[in-house]
Curated annotation (Swiss-Prot):
Assembly and binders: Homodimer.
Pathway assignment: Pyrimidine metabolism; dTTP biosynthesis
HAMAP family: Thymidy_synth_bact
This protein's GO CC annotations: cytosol
GO biological process: dTMP biosynthetic process; dTTP biosynthetic process; methylation
Primary localisation category: cytoplasm
Active site: C146 (nucleophile)
Gene name of the encoded protein: thyA
Keyword list, A-Z: Cytoplasm, Methyltransferase, Nucleotide biosynthesis, Transferase
Name of the protein in question: Thymidylate synthase
């Protein structure tokens, strides 16, 4: 994950000081891209330990179409707690938009089901897209989508994915997002009888919070380790039937975790 460290270093050394919604303050650049060949290892940060349980359960929760944190809480995942209301509700966020995008005539579109079917039936389509950025429902969301839009691409029997992330918390958020969408790409590739190609991460406002500077310096001082490989233990009937125990990262070694506050 040298690419990630190069990205972090670039923003830390060359970013512009900016204010932000949370009042924390950031150092930021606009526009950055990283490309990861998923055949060279699973792109998980090794210069600090990631909570893989949270990454996997969050993705499974998105795929359920859920907007309530109960599933996450039941599985020991707390990453959405700060934004949920007293009943655990978050409004029409990622999972709802992925699985039940509302139409003007009262129907709902399951974007995940549709994109998987399109990949199978028309892999050369340039419309293999899922969007969470529903302008009409943003006011009802506790947190508007940071990773807002993703597109698939099939070539030479391999599935690639590109994510556009409008707001990128480089220290805390981006490592989760890279791993999550790489995992989703592997899952959909398996469901569509394809190999994996590249995961392309594209960021808009790419920032380091001012209260993460010390942690960033620590992380930049560490040498990355060899990437692990992802093992999916079996193929379920659909993209929605994967379970936490279906996934194993083989050979994952990392430096110790680095704690940092979340800007809410």
């Amino acid at each position: 994950m040298k690419q990630y460290l190069d990205f972090m270093r670039h923003v830390y050394e060359h970013g512009t000081e900016k204010s932000d919604r949370t009042g924390t303050g950031t150092r930021s650049v606009f526009g950055y891209q990283m490309r990861f060949d998923l055949n060279e290892g699973f792109p998980v940060v090794t210069t600090k330990k990631l909570h893989l349980k949270s990454i996997i359960h969050e993705l499974l929760w998105f795929l359920q179409g859920s907007t309530n944190i109960k599933y996450l809480k039941d599985n020991g995942v707390t990453i959405w707690d700060e934004w949920a209301d007293a009943n655990g509700e978050l409004g029409p966020i990622y999972g709802y938009q992925w699985r039940a995008w509302p139409t003007p005539d009262g129907r709902h579109i399951d974007q995940i089901t549709e994109v998987v079917q399109q990949i199978r039936d028309n892999p050369d389509s340039r419309r293999l897209i899922v969007s969470a950025w529903n302008v009409g429902e943003i006011p009802q969301m506790k947190l508007p989508p940071c990773h807002a839009f993703f597109q698939f691409y099939v070539a030479d029997g391999k599935l690639s994915c590109q994510l556009y992330q409008r707001s990128a918390d480089i220290f805390l958020g981006v490592p989760f997002n890279i791993a999550s969408y790489a995992l989703l790409t592997h899952m959909i590739a398996q469901q569509c009888d394809l190999g994996v190609g590249d995961f392309v991460w594209t960021g808009g406002d790419c920032h380091i919070y001012s209260n993460h500077f010390e942690q960033v310096e620590t992380q930049l001082s560490r040498e990355p380790m060899k990437l692990p490989t992802l093992r999916i233990k079996h193929r379920p009937d659909s993209i929605f039937d994967y379970k936490y125990d279906d996934f194993e990262l083989v050979g994952y070694e990392s430096h110790p975790a680095i704690k940092a506050p979340v800007a809410v």
